[in-house]
Regions:
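Structured, solvent-exposed acidic/aromatic patches
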Residues: 42-171
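Membrane-embedded catalytic interface detector for glycan/lipid assembly enzymes
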Residues: 37-41
Length: 171
């Protein structure tokens, strides 16, 4: 469970960036501003900010370059380890969808359906294809995780790898 659990931990860390620069760049300055979740009330720094839609060149791709591997690398490893089955894979599907949703909010279309273990630099999906694929993955993940919960399967071995609910998936 520890190898599988570590991949789940890696995916959860993508949800809320713990490292200071990542948190500032991804969660606050870029995701919040570009995604339209917040607006800056006072000018910060000098020219080249996201709230003026004129970011510094070095900042533009930071979330993408950071989050794509955080989402897809552990997901692909988990898919291989679980043969694309079971509650851990279902959990990973849900986390992958959330990460892709965040990236889409910042950048629009992203690569999703064609990303595999060989290459992340693949053709981008249109937003229609992206959202249809994300909803399909989300539905499958929720259905499989719900089946696991309803069956009463013991998931306590994953508790140390769940930052939020300690593997109590009834929550």
């Amino acid at each position: 469970a520890s190898l599988v659990g570590n991949y789940i931990l890696n995916m959860q860390q993508m949800l809320v960036q713990g490292q200071q620069n990542n948190s500032q760049m991804i969660d606050h300055m870029i995701n919040s501003e570009y995604g339209g979740y917040i607006a800056c009330v006072a000018q910060w720094g000098n020219a080249g900010n996201f709230y003026t839609y004129d970011p510094r060149i070095g900042w533009v791709g930071y979330p993408f370059d950071t989050m794509m591997p955080q989402i897809f690398t552990p997901f692909i490893m988990l898919k291989d380890l679980t043969n694309g089955e079971g509650p851990v894979y279902a959990w990973a599907q849900i986390l992958k969808v959330y990460g892709a949703y965040l990236l889409n909010g910042m950048y629009g279309p992203i690569a999703y359906t064609k990303v595999d273990g060989e290459n992340m630099a693949v053709e981008y999906d249109s937003e229609e294809v992206l959202f249809n694929a994300m909803f399909a993955d989300l539905d499958e993940g929720i259905t499989n995780l719900t089946s696991t919960v309803l069956s009463g399967e013991d998931m306590s071995s994953l508790a140390t790898f769940d930052y939020v609910y300690n593997a109590d998936f009834t929550k």
